[in-house]
Regions:
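Short catalytic/metal-binding and nucleic-acid-binding patches
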Residues: 1-167
Length: 167
């Protein structure tokens, strides 16, 4: 059984962000990431950064592994406004999907169904400001793109990502 990931003891602090050095290697340590693939990885990295609220402070993309320095800020104490949520959703979802969510939120607010509006927010915000969710989504999306592009199946990464607390 896997040991739980060690997260910063202050990860639930309302003010202090956590910094992590994250590393992941390609399966069999094969040298498969060329310049265009690394550019696509950067694209997925920025998409996930814009959605999640996590900040990529630095990165190094190699042919068979990568290093990320991530800042995981605390979730805003008052949550996200509807506009902030929709802005983040635009980073990763299609315009028609975001328009549907915007319509749902508008209807819920008009009818004073705050519980329903909170449920809509919760469908997405549980994946924000979270190290594991950030890395899971980044690695999954890049793997799906890579596998589709190279007509392959299966895992692309050697094992689960490693993370070290920096601060």
């Amino acid at each position: 059984m896997r040991k739980p990931r060690f997260l910063a003891p202050w990860k639930d602090s309302p003010t202090k962000p956590a910094l992590y050095h994250c590393i992941s290697r390609v399966v069999d340590r094969r040298f498969i990431l060329n310049d265009s693939q690394r550019e696509n990885f950067r694209k997925f990295l920025r998409i996930q950064e814009n959605f999640s609220g996590c900040r990529v402070l630095s990165y190094c993309l190699m042919s068979n592994h990568f290093h990320l320095l991530l800042e995981i800020p605390p979730f805003p104490a008052n949550g996200l406004t509807d506009q902030e949520l929709l802005h983040r959703l635009n980073a990763t979802y299609s315009e028609p999907f975001v328009a549907t969510i915007a319509k749902e939120l508008t209807e819920a607010r008009k009818q004073n169904h705050e519980t329903h509006a909170a449920e809509i927010h919760a469908r997405f915000t549980h994946r924000m400001h979270d190290l594991s969710q950030f890395m899971k989504t980044l690695l999954q999306r890049f793997t799906q793109w890579f596998n589709r592009t190279h007509q392959r199946t299966g895992t692309l990464w050697e094992e689960r990502f490693k993370s070290l607390i920096v601060q």
